[in-house]
Amino acid sequence: MRRDFRIFALAGIGLTAACATVPAPGDPAVPVYAVAETQPVVTANEDAADDPAIWRNAAAPADSLIVATDKKAGLYVYDLGGQPQSFTAHAALNNVDLVDMEDQGIVVFASDRSDLAQARIALFRLDTASGSLVELGSVASGPGEAYGICG
């Protein structure tokens, strides 16, 4: 009886040890610190600054631009130092993304949440020379709330 208990106890310890998690292989975590920060958006204290998309200038990386939302007021374009280059007023935009369409330029997409029943995607072209946005219009994206974009 005592021998059976020992076998059962050893088996239990072995099974418990097999359940231990093993850290995932990979490089250790490295802290990343900001070297620049944007000023608070127009609608301060409203949890409105959100969702940046970065256009990387391959020819001159320091001239890359960031497009980000002020969910209550519109879209900002920032330089990499966090300085605003332009602002496009347009209430209720969120979930911004951009795509390099080569000859057609950089197209910026943002979910237009001004009509929660009929979702739309607002479209802009990013003028990379001036750091401004040119509104192209919007397209319907189906019934319901426009909350994100799948590329």
Predicted features and spans:
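Bacterial N-terminal signal peptides that target proteins for export
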Residues: 1-9
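C-terminal motif of bacterial Sec signal peptides marking the signal peptidase cleavage site
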Residues: 16-18
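Sequence/structural signature of beta-propeller domains
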Residues: 20-151
